[in-house]
């Protein structure tokens, strides 16, 4: 028996207990040491390889000398394992935009009992220009090497195993495009396991799979000790700008799984993505995902990949999965359970309908309260930090503001319905959402189906027990709700950050709805007064305290623009958050301004005029051939060993295609941003290389004006003081600092 006066306290206690249990069961496994048996995966062995690969602790983008050095070290590691390998060196470009490079992919083979199809293990070995790349994607590379060592001991398997270490992933999946579109072995691959990383910690999860994934998911769950992943992430990933090499695999209609982690995201694409910062538990989880799964897949038939499955796990350590086509049946089962429960409980259908109407009010007040709190945080401080170095003010603000909003919703609802009516109304509203999600977002259906079936079953049982014991069953409806709502928040906090607080608040709102009937006995006015004071305190602390640390710095890039024709030079400090001292003192211009000659509408903030770099711009030699089409042959060089050369051609230039080496590419017209209205050709990894580029134009096109740029991460020496001050609690990110020299040319 649970007295109503204690019900709310028990519900809150149970919420924290269930959240803690779910959080504990989804942590990555402990790393295994050097004494681990040879046929098992050891994160320590893998980490030792990573330390030798990245001994310089410096970035190694495509085309750089250090990237080639690391490639040679990878060859040495494969030689130590006795695994034959080859190199693919070719020009290639991205699919979505013309970002091109001469890539150097590594392909290694562990022979099988048959010649094909291959099981491929894939990761990329290049980094962005600002990060050493231990997490992205050094951890994936060494996980494959350590797994390959163990696989080699037991080979041959039925299927041969291929290792693909791609180059130039960071500039648009270019290495993967080169392999899957140009290499003859690509057609011999049956399954790909891609391994990625984003940040420096977190569980290695199934990020996404190919469409027909029954064989893959069943093998994964059967063979892996700590399976982790939710199919709803596929729905999120479809709508995000992020990408991995697995996208190329999908476009090639090859089956597979994309594994990734996303913890400590402040380190992602920054100088903090180091060997010292990478969590060995994450590497261990990578290995425990791919090694046993590879052994299984390499040993079974792949004639039938089965149906499309949705999946979710771990939920308190348990994995759930079923055919996507079953989701509607399970939704109907939940409907039957709830209808029977309503009938047996003799609850008022009319009042339950009112409870349905109250449900979106509770969700809305919870979500709106959280939005208002973080809007005020942004208003007072000028920023919301994605991953603050000091987290507790943001976390308290999230908890207290949503609790405040949720209780406001409860106070409104209990004026119209009682506890039982609200309980049934809440789950009927959840059921409506379940059908909508099942139809429109099928990969996320299990997130809603599991809680409503569980609740429907408990509510039906409650109609057969004594009144004194019903409250226990009502409490237990929280058991399946927590992992599907609050249990996902920590992962979203780590992967999306507080700038995308909108990804978290709906989950909090849904849980507020489910727990709301259990809070009807609270003295809400007094409690909300206390919660309001906590919210205000967290808001003020979060607004007026410096929350940046060296481990979680503010991301700020330094951009230097020089128009070589006009003689104008500018410096811009680029950050998603408001600048603070001492960097703000370098900016003396308040109005936004166009800093490049080719785009008068793209305005930049946080800029100031600057001295010339005294650098020489890129060199150009051209040869024009007129025939059926106009062919222009260009030889391009950077006179300062810049990493990138960029060619801009206006949309009316008549450009139809271009060649790099023997590879023909289609130009892509930029439709937004700095390069809007231009065909943009990015030539990456140039440095001291001379690039021959052939451009095909419509035959009737005369000479056209274009822009040629070379871009380096090295800044002019007169910016040394600014560069020095941009350290400590500041850090570059992604492509980082850019020195851009621009000149107009005729073609």
Question: What are the residue ranges of the model-derived segments?
Answer:
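Soluble extramembrane regions of membrane proteins in the secretory/endomembrane system
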Residues: 28-320, 672-680, 684-698
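A broad structural signal for short, well-ordered beta-strand segments within beta-sheet-rich domains
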Residues: 114, 189, 480-481, 642, ...
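Extracytosolic and intramembrane catalytic regions of membrane-associated proteins
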Residues: 68, 72-109, 141-142, 219-222, ...
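Juxtamembrane/start-of-transmembrane alpha-helix segments at the extracytoplasmic/lumenal side
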Residues: 313-332, 388-395
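Alpha-helical transmembrane segments of integral membrane proteins, especially early/N-terminal helices
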Residues: 251, 287-295, 325-328, 357-365
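Transmembrane signal-anchor helices characteristic of membrane glycosylation enzymes that use polyprenol
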Residues: 15-29
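Alpha-helical transmembrane segments of integral membrane proteins
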Residues: 17, 336-619
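N-terminal Sec-pathway targeting helices
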Residues: 1-12, 524-530
């Amino acid at each position: 028996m649970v007295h109503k006066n204690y019900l709310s306290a028990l519900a809150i206690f149970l919420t924290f207990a269930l959240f803690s249990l779910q959080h504990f069961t989804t942590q990555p496994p402990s790393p295994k040491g050097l004494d681990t048996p040879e046929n098992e995966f050891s994160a320590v062995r893998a980490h030792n390889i990573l330390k030798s690969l990245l001994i310089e602790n410096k970035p190694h983008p495509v085309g750089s000398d250090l990237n080639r050095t690391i490639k040679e070290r990878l060859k040495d590691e494969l030689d130590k394992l006795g695994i034959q390998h080859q190199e693919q060196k070719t020009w290639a470009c991205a699919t979505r935009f013309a970002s091109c490079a001469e890539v150097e992919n590594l392909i290694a083979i562990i022979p099988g009992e048959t010649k094909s199809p291959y099981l491929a293990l894939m990761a990329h070995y290049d980094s962005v220009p600002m990060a050493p790349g231990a997490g992205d994607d050094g951890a994936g590379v060494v996980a494959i090497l350590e797994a390959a060592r163990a696989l080699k001991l037991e080979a041959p398997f039925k299927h041969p195993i291929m290792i693909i270490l791609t180059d130039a992933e960071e500039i648009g999946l270019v290495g993967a495009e080169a392999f899957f579109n140009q290499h003859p072995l690509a057609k011999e691959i049956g399954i790909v396991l891609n391994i990625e990383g984003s940040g420096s910690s977190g569980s290695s999860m199934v990020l996404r799979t190919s469409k027909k994934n029954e064989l893959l998911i069943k093998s994964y769950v059967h063979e892996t000790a700590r399976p982790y992943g939710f199919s709803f992430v596929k729905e999120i990933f479809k709508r995000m700008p992020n990408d991995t090499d697995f996208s190329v695999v999908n476009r090639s209609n090859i089956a597979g799984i994309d594994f990734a982690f996303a913890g400590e995201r402040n380190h992602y694409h920054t100088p903090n993505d180091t060997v010292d910062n990478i969590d060995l538990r994450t590497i261990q989880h990578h290995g425990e995902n791919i090694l046993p799964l590879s052994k299984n897949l390499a040993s079974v038939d792949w004639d039938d990949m089965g149906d499309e499955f949705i999946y979710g796990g771990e939920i308190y350590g348990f994995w759930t999965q079923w055919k996507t086509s079953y989701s509607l049946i399970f939704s109907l089962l939940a409907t039957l359970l709830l209808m029977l429960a309503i009938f047996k409980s003799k609850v008022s259908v009319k009042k339950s309908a009112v409870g349905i109407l109250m449900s979106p009010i509770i969700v809305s007040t919870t979500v709106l309260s959280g939005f208002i709190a973080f809007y005020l945080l942004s208003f007072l401080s000028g920023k919301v930090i994605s991953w603050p170095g000091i987290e507790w003010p943001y976390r308290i603000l999230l908890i207290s503001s949503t609790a405040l909003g949720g209780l406001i919703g409860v106070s409104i609802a209990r004026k119209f319905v009682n506890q039982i009516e609200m309980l049934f109304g809440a789950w009927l509203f959840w059921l409506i959402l379940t059908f909508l999600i099942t139809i429109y977002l099928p990969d996320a259906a299990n997130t809603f189906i599991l809680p409503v079936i569980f609740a429907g079953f408990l509510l039906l049982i409650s109609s057969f027990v004594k009144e004194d014991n019903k409250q226990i069953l009502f409490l237990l409806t929280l058991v399946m709700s927590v992992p599907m709502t609050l249990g996902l928040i920590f992962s979203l906090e780590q992967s999306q950050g507080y700038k995308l607080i909108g990804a978290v608040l709906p989950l909090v709102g849904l849980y507020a709805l489910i727990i709301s009937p259990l809070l009807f006995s609270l003295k809400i006015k007094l409690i909300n007064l206390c919660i309001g004071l906590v919210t205000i305190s967290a808001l003020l602390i979060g607004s007026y305290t410096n929350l940046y640390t060296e481990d979680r710095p503010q991301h700020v890039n330094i951009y230097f623009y020089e128009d070589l024709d006009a003689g104008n030079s500018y410096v811009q400090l680029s950050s998603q958050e408001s600048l603070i001292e001492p960097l703000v003192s370098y900016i003396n211009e308040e109005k936004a301004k166009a800093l490049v000659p080719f785009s008068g509408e793209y305005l930049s903030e946080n800029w100031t005029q600057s001295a010339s770099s005294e650098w020489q711009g890129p060199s150009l030699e051209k040869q024009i051939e007129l025939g059926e089409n106009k062919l222009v042959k260009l030889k391009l060089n950077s006179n300062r060993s810049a990493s990138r050369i960029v060619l801009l051609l206006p949309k009316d230039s008549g450009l139809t295609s271009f060649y790099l080496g023997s590879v023909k590419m289609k130009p892509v017209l930029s439709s937004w941003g700095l390069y809007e209205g231009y065909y943009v050709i990015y030539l990456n990894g140039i440095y001291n290389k001379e690039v021959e580029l052939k451009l095909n134009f419509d035959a009737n096109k005369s000479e056209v004006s274009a822009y040629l740029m070379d871009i380096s991460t090295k800044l002019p020496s007169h910016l040394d003081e600014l560069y020095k001050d941009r350290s400590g609690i500041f850090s570059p990110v992604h492509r980082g600092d850019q020195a851009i020299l621009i000149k107009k040319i005729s073609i």
